[in-house]
Amino acid sequence: MCGIVGYIGQSDAFPVLIEGLKRLEYRGYDSAGVALIGNQDNLNVYKTKGKVSNLEAMAADKDCSGHIGIAHTRWATHGEPSAANAHPHVSMSGELALVHNGIIENYQVLKEQLADKGYTFKSSTDTEVLVQLIDHYYQQNGKDLVSAVCQALNDAIGAYAITVMEKKDPGHIVAARQSSPLVVGVGKDNKDFYIASDATPIVEHTNKVVYLEDGEIADIRVGEELNIINLEHASCSYTIKTVDLDISKLSKGGFDHYMLKEIYDQPNCLKDCMSGRLIVDKEHPENNHIVLSALRDYRDRLVNAKHIIIVACGTSWHAGLIGKQLIEKMCRKRVEVAYASEFRYADPVIEPEDVVIAISQSGETADTLAAIKLAKEKGALIFGIVNAVGSSIARETDTGVYIHVGPEIGVASTKAFTGQVTVLTLLALALGHEQGTLDDADYHEMIEELSEIPQKMEKVLEQAPMIKSLALMFTYAHNFLYLGRGMNFPVALEGALKLKEISYIHAEGYPAAEMKHGPIALVDQDMPIVFIATHHQLYEKIISNMQEVKSRNGRILAIVTEGDELVKNIADNEIEIPKTQNALIPLLSVVPLQLLAYYVAVDKGLDVDMPRNLAKSVTVE
């Protein structure tokens, strides 16, 4: 939930570090800091509560010289948000500086042991305990930093990604990871090295990266080949990978916020997601087909699986609920959808014949990563659906499909959700047809319909000005209720989540029929009720639910299929979406809800891209 940036090389470190932190702002944070070994071999540390821009302003008249440094954006886990608790932390000796992402679970025990040895602490963080522990071994072993890091990490219990540097050697930096992501970028001729929580701060400098694995330590020296060892000092082999990441996609592209850009990106993102996978022949629809290498490579395991478990968190979990309905309908397989955080501790029943589908935008979600490791131990096939290429989940899975929607910077997920649903649709269609539970006619028709979704999505986006006007009518609200049935129930959950994430308005999503089992007690003229009331097999039933709300003076905003006249006679306001197959409705019905949440939050003057208390990538439990 924090961002780490490190640099060592030929250039001035400070600009590299600050720009790197700005690239990581999307992850969420409450404070920022930087440490540099200056040209006079002095260790300079600057930290502040608030934005990276505050840190940049603070350091403007300070000594920011040097060719080595580490920097950090922090989300508070141990200790309140403050300059004192911000990273980097410096050892009591003043010789070491460290940044850390993760949680050291036994930090209190270690802190007491260090206090008995005379160490004192300036903060209430677990990170300061870790740097003092490294310093303890550093002073004992003749100031060998790598050995000290190995010894300290053998004592520590928990998750960590760390980068540490020593004042006496400005040509040396050490990084390590355990259950928290860390990437090393390798510059030309090993003259520059970059360290970061993900590749986004690195790619403008080099596209050559090494993804550290759990238990690995990177021993980095300028001008020498990267050396990676484990905690027992044994050498580890590694592969330098080439990252294909378009820098232009990391900008707002003329939009006011990343979130709005990413909402508008969705038609093109879905085209990218389906490119090379969805093969459409409009003249000969019988030739329509889907190409998924994961299905080709693991056909028998997927076809023969009787039980599929989808594990995910947040928005990805909502996508999983849609995936459940798609796979059960098209493949006639039993599908369970579990919160990864609950699944990993529930002693789940997993058989070797099962398939576990892990969904994560970042590919670094700690609970999802732990869940698939558990399932892997029990012999299940692990199928990943992730966005970030080369991420931890992508590397841990047996097979899978990248959603290929490009970097998602806004904390509130939009294009990743529709990308995940698209991939789940491709999987359900391809697997259902492969095993004979989906006939040729339906298969070919659905493929053509799916290929038209990007164009239909553009028609929804054309209504943004009208949705913006509607949003202005709802900023007064303190509570929202989102209701849908069938495929639109997960959309109701996602719409409610988007609103509460960025507007801080309490919102709940329910199956519309469950309204009578409690939520209807809340209905009055002050509570907006959002119905996703598109044409599908439960249309008449949701009309009945709407009439119940109307009779109690509830204010109804309805998402409807274009041309619908019945809902218009009941709802106070409506937003139309184009007609499509029932199974594809979520890809369209979610878009107006994304826009509604966005415009409500903007009208309230809130920070849409970095809402309070939220992190883009949840890399700790």
Model-derived features: positions:
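Glycine-rich phosphate-binding loops that contact phosphosugars or nucleotide phosphates
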Residues: 303-445, 449-452, 534-573, 596
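Glycine-rich, anion-gripping cofactor-binding loops and their flanking helix/strand elements
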Residues: 182-188, 192-209, 315, 341-375, ...
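Conserved short alpha-helical segments that host acidic/polar catalytic motifs at enzyme active sites
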Residues: 1-252, 256, 261, 268-307, ...
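Generic C-terminus detector
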Residues: 259, 555, 568-570, 580-621
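Structural beta-sheet core signal
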Residues: 4, 98, 164, 175, ...
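Glycine-rich oxoanion-binding loops at beta->alpha junctions
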Residues: 50, 67, 71-84, 281-299, ...
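Active-site phosphate/pyrophosphate-binding segments
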Residues: 154, 266-270, 274-309, 399-528, ...
